[in-house]
Amino acid sequence: MDIILLIQAVIMGIVEGITEFLPISSTGYLILSADLMGFWTKEKVDLFVVVVQFGAILAVIYDYWDRLWQALMGLLTGKAEGMSNPRQLGLSLIVATIPVMIVGFTFADEIKAYLFDPIVVAIMLIIGGLLIFYVENRPKPIIAQEAEDVGLKTALMIGLFQCLALIPGTSRSGATIVGALWLGVSRKASAEFSFFLGIPVIVGAALLDLLKHKDVLTSSEDWLVLGIGTVVSFIVALLCIRLLVAWVSRRDFKIFAWLRIITGVLVLIAAWGFGYQMAG
C-alpha cells in the first residue's frame, strides 16, 4: 500500500472541504493541488475531483438536516414546522436547479473540451473576484433575509448564474453567491441557499461520474484513496460551513475576492511564463 498516496488523498480531501463552499473554485484548487503533488493519473484525478465533492455535500445534509427535512415535508405535504410558506424553499431549489441541468447535460463535453485551460481558469478566477467586489460595494435592498424567503423568480435567476459555474475557474459557490447578492439576498441566506443548491447538482454529478468511469478504479487501494478523500472532505467541510456562516453573518466576501484574483494572476504567470497546463 502506497502511504504517500494515502497522505495525498487526505490533503486533497482537506483542500476540497475547505474550498467547496467558498466562492473561490474548489475544482481549480483540487486540480492545482493534484498537479503540485503529482497525485494519481489524469483519469483517476478527474474522477476523484468530482466524487470527493460528495463528502462535502454530505456535510451540508448533516448540518442542515432539520431545515432540509422540513423543506421536503413542506414540498410534499404543504405543512412544515416554523415555515409560513412551507413549499417555498423546496420549490425554489427545484427551479434553481433546472437551468444547470439543461445546460450541463447539453454542453458539458464541449465545455470540458474547449474551456478546460489554465488561461480560462485564471481569467474566470479574476473576473469572479472583481464581481464579488462589485456586488459588495453596491449592496441591493434585502429581499430575502433567510434562504426560505428566496422567491421563485429570484431562484431562477440564481440558477442561471449557476450555469456560469460550468466554465472552469468560475466556482459554483461563487456564481450562486454573487448572483444571490446581486439580486438582494442577504449574505447569510446567499451562502445557505448556495449550500442547499449544491445538493442535487453535486450528488447527481458525483454518482453519474462514478457510474460512468468506475472502471478507472482498478484496485482496492484506488477505492480506499477515493474513500479517504471523501471522508476527510466531509469532516473538514462540516467545520468550514459553520465558520463561513459565522463569518458572513458579521463580515463580507471581499477576502475571497482577493484570494481569487491573486490565484488567477499566479495561474496566468505560470501558464504564460512557464507553459503550465492543467492535468485535468
From Swiss-Prot:
Membrane topology value: Multi-pass membrane protein
EC supergroup of this enzyme: hydrolase
Main location: membrane
Subcellular localization(s) per the UniProt record: Cell inner membrane
EC annotation from Swiss-Prot or TrEMBL: 3.6.1.27
GO BP of this protein: cell wall organization; peptidoglycan biosynthetic process; regulation of cell shape; response to antibiotic
Coiled-coil segments: none
Family matches, as Pfam families: BacA (PF02673)
One GO MF term: undecaprenyl-diphosphatase activity
Any GO CC annotation of this UniProt entry: plasma membrane
Reactions accelerated catalytically: di-trans,octa-cis-undecaprenyl diphosphate + H2O = di-trans,octa-cis-undecaprenyl phosphate + phosphate + H(+)
Stretches that traverse the bilayer: 3-23, 45-65, 88-108, 115-135, 150-170, 191-211, 225-245, 255-275
Record bears the keyword Transmembrane: yes
Keywords: Antibiotic resistance, Cell inner membrane, Cell membrane, Cell shape, Cell wall biogenesis/degradation, Hydrolase, Membrane, Peptidoglycan synthesis, Transmembrane, Transmembrane helix
Entry annotated with the keyword tRNA processing: no
InterPro entries tied to this protein: UppP
UniProt-listed HAMAP family: Undec_diphosphatase
Family the UniProt entry places it in: Belongs to the UppP family.
Note: Bacitracin is thought to be involved in the inhibition of peptidoglycan synthesis by sequestering undecaprenyl diphosphate, thereby reducing the pool of lipid carrier available.
Job of this protein: Catalyzes the dephosphorylation of undecaprenyl diphosphate (UPP). Confers resistance to bacitracin.
Protein name in the entry: Undecaprenyl-diphosphatase
Record organism: Psychrobacter arcticus (strain DSM 17307 / VKM B-2377 / 273-4)
